[in-house]
């Protein structure tokens, strides 16, 4: 059978594919490229960029880029702003108070799709963390032998009461991990347990006063709960 005119073995097809890909890449930044070349300058579109972050280990790339002056090389000034909650980050991204943010993948998809709030186009520019979160159970549960999913399920079946767990944002990665982990252990996260939203820096304090039985959050808060 003869090769298709645009099959990978045909140099013309490969060249056309590369041309299309280059055109698509250029089209993804229409405002920036137009502004730059219309002015005949390589100046950044913005000289000061406000980047929101939540105090988690994976915010280090953003914060240290500012502290060590890596931004100066590109003619911009990074202004890192410490935020209190993921909901606050979402709202500031939507209303323009923040130019970009260290943020949960699920949160960005939620905003892009208009889930749980206003809809606004979003783009993920880079990954700062691959996994890195932990599920932590209270010392009271651990003392009763609940140290993993199966033993937690046994304890919940034995001691019938309301069990409360926390994630950091309804459409966030931590909530997804928590739901999946509970379900995999035979615990219905929507019927057998109560799942609440708590900002990462407040997880340990809420655990200490008995407001929750466990939580899922990014580091260093899981480690802080242990030490």
Feature roles, as predicted:
Residues 1-15:
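N-terminal secretory signal peptides
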Residues 4, 19-38:
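N-terminal export signals
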Residues 17-18, 179:
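Short, cationic motifs built from Arg/Lys/His that form the positively charged side of catalytic pockets
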Residues 39-190, 194-196, 211-226:
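Short, glycine-/small- and polar/acidic-enriched structural segments
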Residues 197-201:
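Active-site glycine-rich loop that binds ribose-phosphate moieties when present
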């Amino acid at each position: 059978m003869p090769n298709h005119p645009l099959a990978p073995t045909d140099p013309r097809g490969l060249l056309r594919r590369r041309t299309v890909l280059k055109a698509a890449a250029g089209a993804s930044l229409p405002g920036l490229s137009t502004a730059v070349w219309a002015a005949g300058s390589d100046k950044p579109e913005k000289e000061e960029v406000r980047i929101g972050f939540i105090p988690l280990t994976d915010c280090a790339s953003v914060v240290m880029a500012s502290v060590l002056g890596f931004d100066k090389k590109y003619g911009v000034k990074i202004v890192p702003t410490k935020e209190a909650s993921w909901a606050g980050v979402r709202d500031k991204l939507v209303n323009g108070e923040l130019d970009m943010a260290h943020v949960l993948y699920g949160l960005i998809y939620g905003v892009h799709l208009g889930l749980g709030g206003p809809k606004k186009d979003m783009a993920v520019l880079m990954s700062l963390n691959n996994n890195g979160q932990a599920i932590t159970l209270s010392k009271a549960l651990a003392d009763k032998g609940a140290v993993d999913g199966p033993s937690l399920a046994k304890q919940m079946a034995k001691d019938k009461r309301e069990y409360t767990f926390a994630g950091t944002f309804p459409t966030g990665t931590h909530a997804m991990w928590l739901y999946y982990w509970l379900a995999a252990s035979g615990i219905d996260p929507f019927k057998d347990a109560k799942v609440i939203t708590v900002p990462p820096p407040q997880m340990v304090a809420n655990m200490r006063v008995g407001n929750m039985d466990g939580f899922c959050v990014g580091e260093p808060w899981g480690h802080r709960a242990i030490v």
